[in-house]
């Protein structure tokens, strides 16, 4: 687990006994997952979102002993609708995307790629279904869709204590736009090549 993220979670737990997270792009909950250890160590409550059926089944199985978790089998988009998502034929794909080119860039042979009809929810609909007005941690790893999802979030009114997202597939202008919005809304950013962890500054 990312050391900075774990420290941020542990610190937030001191202030919030009702810690709650949203994880968009949870995959199977275990493979290179930044929250798996913390969920088990602290018994964190939250909603885990994963659009791929095979991965979603493994996700629920891997967390079957964690009754405080909710699971949503959907992708996050700008409308509540069904869209085509591209994934591997064998169902084991950490690079699933609405953009077929994203998989090809990951050296997945075209003959191994299938188009899968996928239910989609807006970010606001996801929040509504979670039943929460405040979220302590927003974790996003959406294989190139992180920027589009972050654009849906109104950080002036929805302010998680911690925001973590993947910046690897963003353009320079997209990285700068997200960083600017977060800084303007009181976050301190800690970035590496792949990810950004944004922590709300103390009032």
Task: For the regions a language model picked out, list residue spans one by one.
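Phosphate/nucleotide-binding beta-alpha loop and adjacent structural elements of enzyme active sites
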Residues: 1-203
